[in-house]
Amino acid sequence: MNAANASADEVKTSQVNSPNTLDQYNEFIQVSNNQFVYENNSNQVSSQTLSEINTLLSETNAYVRDNNLTIDPKTKTATQYIHLGNPLLRSYGKNGILAVRWNSVRIGLDKGLVNDVLHAGIAGAAGYLGFLASGPGAAGVVAVASVIVDRHLDTKSGWWFDFNYFTRTVTGYGRQ
């Protein structure tokens, strides 16, 4: 992939190399009563790592609860229930937080917003992405803007970004 210009032909889904994202603990994350729960009976996890996991779970569960999200126990992903019969909601989720996982969020930006961020640059992105000012996506504003500007993503469509809020990095992105 050309780092200077990521187009539809070059990018279906991209993974960004990142340090420890805590993804190795995904198998121990369960869903109980619409909350993410860490279930590992072995003592092979350091107390510091366990504390980090529990902090993330607490923050994520609070976000899920406060925003009336529903966690799918099979996918371990929280989303809002959207009644698809309403034609006004067909484009729901193109801008904002599309999905919440225990240690990351998927942030969506529509074509217009990607174009605005690309032209405004990283410094101007904070204003354009102000809708993410709270919750687990808040720290993702600069990270997402950095990927858009650094990779010079084309604006033929919207993009999604996976933001790991433990490492505060974008770990993947692709077209909406």
Give, region by region, the residue ranges found by the protein language model:
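Soluble non-cytosolic domains of exported or imported proteins
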Residues: S47, G112-A120, G135, A139
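Amphipathic alpha-helical interaction segments
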Residues: N33-F36, Q44, I71, D110, ...
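Canonical hydrophobic alpha-helical transmembrane segment
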Residues: N5-A6, A138-D150
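N-terminal propeptides/leader regions of secreted preproproteins
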Residues: A3-N103
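Short hydrophobic membrane-inserting alpha-helices and related fusion/pore-forming segments
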Residues: G124-V142
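Short intrinsically disordered, low-complexity coil segments enriched in acidic
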Residues: M1-A8, A125, L129
